[in-house]
Amino acid sequence: MSSVDLNADLGEGFGVWALGDDDAMLDIVTSANVACGFHAGDPATLRRVCEAAAARGVRIGAQVSYRDLAGFGRRFIDVSSEDLIADVMYQIGALSALAAAAGSSVSYVKPHGALYNAVVTNRLQAHALAAAVHAVDPALPVLGLAGSVFFGAAEELGLRTVPEAFADRAYRPDGRLVSRRERNSVLHDVDEIAERVISMVSRGRVHAVDGSTIPITVESVCVHGDSPGAVQIATAVRKRLVAEGVTLASFS
């Protein structure tokens, strides 16, 4: 692969509580998955992140979530399709206003946390999520897991789907992410993470937790902004990709 996008979850602080180094990450990534206030992010924080992203030419994506501030959007919620559609439309609309005020726009949509994992297999929520994005703007790409039910629903509506891989998350043999509730679900060794990203991007393969090698399709690589050592990890991944001749460029 000659080029790949590098994305990170940003804007996840709230009030006086900060999470991660948004400014440092924005100097590294090409796309910013900005929280929309449902799992994290107050309006002032989200505005600042949009302004900082716009100043650097980093694409802004709406990272939509269940309405779950207390659980950081990492708890499954059995929400109705009608409510989920409205919630997602609301979040995209709110971030779009902040991005527009910063001289930019929302370029794509990515589900967060438990919603991301749910729409891999949950048909009702996958179709609701896709319907919400389509209702707001049929031209908006969606970021997610290749082969997911969500991608199928999105493609039925004509939405562009962008498969991503996670630099610092462990994979199951079936290609899904290992739950954060399980041991070793998040990787921390910088060199190991950089090497596996090269394998995913250049060779389309990644080692699963059982030791098997599984195929993976990737147009964007996610480096989590809230992980310990996030800036160091993202820097190492970027440097390694560039050293391998891969161009870092947004997909949107």
Swiss-Prot record:
UniProt cross-references to HAMAP family, sorted A to Z: PxpA
Q: Catalysed reaction per UniProt?
A: 5-oxo-L-proline + ATP + 2 H2O = L-glutamate + ADP + phosphate + H(+)
What CDD domains would the database entry show? LamB_YcsF_like
- The enzyme's E.C. designation: 3.5.2.9
Single annotated GO MF: ATP binding
User: Which organism was this protein described from?
Assistant: Mycolicibacterium gilvum (strain PYR-GCK)
What lineage does the source organism belong to? Answer: Bacteria, Bacillati, Actinomycetota, Actinomycetes, Mycobacteriales
Stated name of the protein: 5-oxoprolinase subunit A
What keywords are assigned to this protein? ATP-binding, Hydrolase, Nucleotide-binding
Role this protein plays = Catalyzes the cleavage of 5-oxoproline to form L-glutamate coupled to the hydrolysis of ATP to ADP and inorganic phosphate.
User: What InterPro entries does the database record attribute to this sequence?
Assistant: Glyco_hydro/deAcase_b/a-brl, LamB/YcsF/PxpA-like
Describe its partners and assembly state.
Answer: Forms a complex composed of PxpA, PxpB and PxpC.
Instruction: Provide the family line.
Output: Belongs to the LamB/PxpA family.
Which top class of enzyme applies to this chain? hydrolase
Q: Which GO terms describe its biological process?
A: carbohydrate metabolic process
